[in-house]
Amino acid sequence: KLIHPKAKSGNATMALARTGTFPLPALPGRKPGRVMLIGIGPGKAEWRTPEASQMILGADELVGYDLYIDLLGAAAAHIPRRDFKLGEEEARCRYALESAATGKDVAVICSGDAGIYAMGALVYELLDRSQDAGGVSSAARRVTISTAPGISALQAAAARSGAILGHDFCAISLSDLLTPWAAIEKRIHAAGAGDFVVAFYNPVSRRRRTQLAAARDILMQYRGGDVPVLLASSLGRPEEELKFRTLGSLDIDEVDMLTTVMVGASSSRHLSLGRGEAVYTPRGYAKHLDRDNHAAVSYTHLRAHETLLY
């Protein structure tokens, strides 16, 4: 018996009825869909979290840039996929949300971490808009969103090269496709004034070759040209390459679209070790190390003096 007629809102449609039969007989329905934002790291399977792998295996559909899905290898072999090209980010996220609205568990595959310069923010931006304002359908706005974190390029680069992120750092994308260069320039000045280690994402593209040189010149106003710079390319892949440079010697022609550029702070140091090179940024333990060393030296001198007395 119908108690309250159907009513609609922006978030739900409902009606209320009373039944004399319990439990209810099987009724046709559709399970709620889910969008899974999955960061797969830079590309190496061993760097993918178990949670990300489980989400991929449980997905009804994989959505993403075709290269990123290809990086999954055998893990994606038997799962339906919808490939998108670079530049189709909005279409990618919109499709994932609307597909999930039909009851599917849709995995949006992102390199690195889905919430760092990836699709996570765009998915939420679409959910934050009404359909009339360019958002998604009301059904798509009701899907569940789950996120599996991934290793971002700055983390992978730091791990491969030592501990350049040992103290305060920031990340700045040099792509001015969506962000005005004036805003990016302002952030570089702020990073320089704050003496942050800086990880530059999207340093160059085929058409964009001037921003990294400009960023280098800005940072040299705040720190010397001798601070270490790391060029980390194709991290976690067979063609991985690390190059150790200084800010003053940074050559833009050594950088490509797959490179993350890490610029050290004024305190960052470069080491040449027997097993290779490394860069690190001290956390601030020097005064403790100096104090302990002074105490050890004083104790050694005292023991030597006592030995002479006896």
Language-model segments: residues:
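A contiguous loop/helix-start segment that scaffolds small-molecule binding in enzyme catalytic cores
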Residues: K1-L37, D105-V106, A193-S298
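Class I S-adenosyl-L-methionine
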Residues: A15-A26, R30-A45, P50-I145, D251, ...
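Short gly/ser/thr-rich secondary-structure transition/capping motifs
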Residues: I40-W47, T179-W181, K243-F244
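Short gly/pro/ser/thr-enriched loop/turn and capping motifs at secondary-structure boundaries
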Residues: I69-L71, E89-E90, I116, S152-Q155, ...
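Class I SAM-dependent methyltransferase SAM-binding "motif I" and its flanking Rossmann-like core
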Residues: A118-G194
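Conserved small/polar residues in nucleotide/adenosyl-binding loops
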Residues: Y299-T307
